């Protein structure tokens, strides 16, 4: 999720039970860590009851970006993940306003979710503007990690890809340093059209402050 106090300032209410049952899931970290088998697999069949292309956004915040994708691709399925509940409540409101039937929001620690994602089930992973967390004591909380890339290499279908955007040069460099350890992933510079396809809140925010937006399209290479 993007940096700053934006989520803390949100004025939102907890979704009513019937709306939450449709759009919202909470997977507590303690239980997910100690009893992962109590949670469903993160695939379209388990979460939506059908086989369909599945996109996962890590750190989706208020769901602006992933709801736009879900609106444009009604036959696909989408899961937005964030560790904080309040922005997800706004994401649920957005999905209801748009009448979406192909999206679920999941409050969970993304690092604990990877074990619940089967092989070759994701067409796209979205990781846009993750927090840098560059203090030494926070390094293990980074979403840009070997653990995340290992999950991407395993869970993306051949030809699928991870979309990565950041305004932070150190995070971009870290991603480039980690990639060579994953031979089935290939990092390509994001094209101008990919960078401009839709600008989320954080994209607009950091671009307006004059920060350079860097991006990679990290493709899952088909095995020969």
Curated annotation (Swiss-Prot):
Substrate binds at residue 167. GO terms for molecular function: tRNA (guanine(46)-N7)-methyltransferase activity. The keyword Phosphoprotein does not apply. Keywords: Methyltransferase, S-adenosyl-L-methionine, Transferase, tRNA processing. Its EC number is 2.1.1.33. PANTHER family: 3-DEOXY-D-MANNO-OCTULOSONIC-ACID TRANSFERASE/TRNA GUANINE-N 7 - -METHYLTRANSFERASE, PENTACOTRIPEPTIDE-REPEAT REGION OF PRORP DOMAIN-CONTAINING PROTEIN. Belongs to the class I-like SAM-binding methyltransferase superfamily. TrmB family. This is tRNA (guanine-N(7)-)-methyltransferase. The lineage of its organism: Bacteria, Bacillati, Chloroflexota, Chloroflexia, Chloroflexales. The gene is trmB.
